[in-house]
Curated annotation (Swiss-Prot):
It is found in: Secreted; Target cell membrane. This is Codesane. Changing residue 12 to K: In COD-3; loss of hemolytic activity, but without important change in antimicrobial activity. Keywords: Amidation, Antibiotic, Antimicrobial, Fungicide, Immunity, Innate immunity, Membrane, Secreted, Target cell membrane, Target membrane.
Amino acid sequence: GMASLLAKVLPHVVKLIK
């Protein structure tokens, strides 16, 4: 679902921001 998709994408976004 949406939550699992966010859980997958969020760490990558955080890496990009960092």
